[in-house]
């Protein structure tokens, strides 16, 4: 007799796909990271294909590595060979303003009276349409928005001599979901 041997390659399709990161990932321009996935069953032979609906905003490679290219929101889709799809979103926000500097000056109004002012400056964010300036009067009080400006500078004229003020700046985008976080406090 004749004996015939053959190898059969059995494919094990995925029955589940999970992405460990938050459904909406909030990052700033320049962020790079990788999605962590889990496919079941553990012996699946499926592969994952990644796709971004807006690669100019967020690009994704074949390993699930993402790069935030510009401010906006992109939909990232992971699809298994057997057709299971999981959709996540990446929200690329404005960067928090940097380079904040405070300058306190006095100006003589009359011989006996002076006015005081604090100039707050920061590095311009090219994607910001405006900035919110917040101030608080002590470490125990809460911040109040005192101004909206389109320039990376604000002059606070409602200040008193020998009093400490705390400021925070927030960069604003045309879509409020993409606004920056507030800066740390500056006094």
Each language-model region and where it sits:
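Short beta-strand segments enriched for Tyr within beta-sheet-rich domains
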Residues: 33, 131, 165-169
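Predominantly extracellular/luminal cell-surface or secreted proteins
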Residues: 51-53, 134-139, 168-172
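Short beta-strand segments within Ig-like beta-sandwich modules, predominantly Fibronectin type-III
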Residues: 57-60, 145-150
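Hydrophobic core positions of the immunoglobulin-like beta-sandwich fold
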Residues: 66, 154-157
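Extracellular low-complexity, O-glycosylation-prone stalks/linkers
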Residues: 125-145
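Beta-strand-rich modules
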Residues: 156-177
């Amino acid at each position: 007799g004749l004996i015939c041997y053959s190898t059969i390659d059995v494919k094990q399709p995925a029955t589940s796909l999970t992405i460990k990161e938050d459904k909406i990932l909030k990052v700033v321009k320049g962020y790079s990271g990788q999605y962590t996935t889990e496919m079941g069953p553990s012996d699946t032979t499926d592969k994952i294909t990644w796709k971004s609906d807006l690669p100019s905003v967020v690009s994704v490679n074949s390993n699930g590595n993402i790069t935030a290219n510009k401010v906006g929101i992109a939909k990232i889709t992971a699809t298994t060979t057997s057709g299971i799809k999981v959709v996540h979103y990446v929200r690329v926000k404005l960067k928090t303003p940097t380079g904040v500097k405070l300058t306190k000056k006095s100006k003589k109004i009359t011989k006996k009276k002076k006015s005081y002012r604090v100039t707050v400056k920061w590095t311009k964010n090219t994607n910001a349409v405006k900035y919110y300036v917040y101030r608080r009067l002590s470490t125990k009080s809460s911040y109040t928005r005192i101004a909206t400006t389109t320039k990376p500078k604000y002059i606070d004229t409602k200040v008193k001599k020998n009093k400490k003020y705390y400021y925070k700046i927030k960069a604003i985008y045309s879509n409020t979901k993409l606004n920056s976080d507030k800066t740390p406090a500056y006094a």
